[in-house]
Amino acid sequence: MQGRTPLLETLRELECEIRLLTVYARECCGCYEILRRKLDRLSGLIGEDCSRAQWQADSDDPALQALGLRLRDAAVQALCELEKHLCQGVLHEPGEMGRYLGSLLESIRGELDSAGIDADARVLFVGSGALPTSALVLAREVGAHLCCLDIDEEALGCAREIARCQGLEARMQFSSLPPAELAFSRDATHFLIASLVQQKSAVLAQIRQVMRADAKVLLRHGSGIKGLFNYPVEPAELDGWRVCAERVSQPLYDTLILEKAGR
């Protein structure tokens, strides 16, 4: 019990602070910077060896697991709000955003190489959000064509404006329609499902209906302590799919590369 108290208490404090700051930031923009630092703190904890070891040691503790679920919900909501706020700054400094995107290319290089994403790729990105950095990198640095999906119309509006400011309108389109209702889905070479998408099995089922036989799915997810900031994928959700490349591990999330089983 003594070994788990520091992590439990730290996560409890973070959950409370993140929830309060998310509310306060809607009234006072100055709170967004504090909120960003709290989310950075959570990201840092996830990457710390001692935190990972402590989480693993106490993984069966119901109190820790329940807190983890609450913290994840708070963090996901906070990140969505923060991205919309950050979007305004990005629109005023398009040059800075361009340099930032260039620096991000190496961080997703493992996913690109494992899935075979290049300039000829057509990628449907599910759960792209207001600040779809991965999609922007693929369009700007790789030259791929993308369709970004999100159920949040406000987030789509933000992302659309960023794409316009970066001169990427010809390579990026945006929609709130389900994957099964998009013509783009039938021609897509790749499907990228964001780690913040909760209903991964439902999205996979829709994609399966319309995807071409040789298309691949990049499924970002979080398990263990990475689940504090990302939704997991359960083994049963992968029925009918085959893992076709080695899992790509990032500090905050992991990526499975999938194709239809029985090809």
From Swiss-Prot:
It catalyses: L-histidine + S-adenosyl-L-methionine = (2S)-2-amino-4-{[(1S)-1-carboxy-2-(1H-imidazol-4-yl)ethyl]amino}butanoate + S-methyl-5'-thioadenosine + H(+). One of its GO terms (biological process) is nicotianamine biosynthetic process. The keyword Transferase applies. It is an enzyme of class 2 (transferase). SUPFAM superfamilies: S-adenosyl-L-methionine-dependent methyltransferases. InterPro entries: Nicotian_synth, SAM-dependent_MTases_sf. Pfam families: NAS. Belongs to the methyltransferase superfamily. CntL family. This is L-histidine 2-aminobutanoyltransferase. It comes from Pseudomonas aeruginosa (strain ATCC 15692 / DSM 22644 / CIP 104116 / JCM 14847 / LMG 12228 / 1C / PRS 101 / PAO1). The gene is cntL.
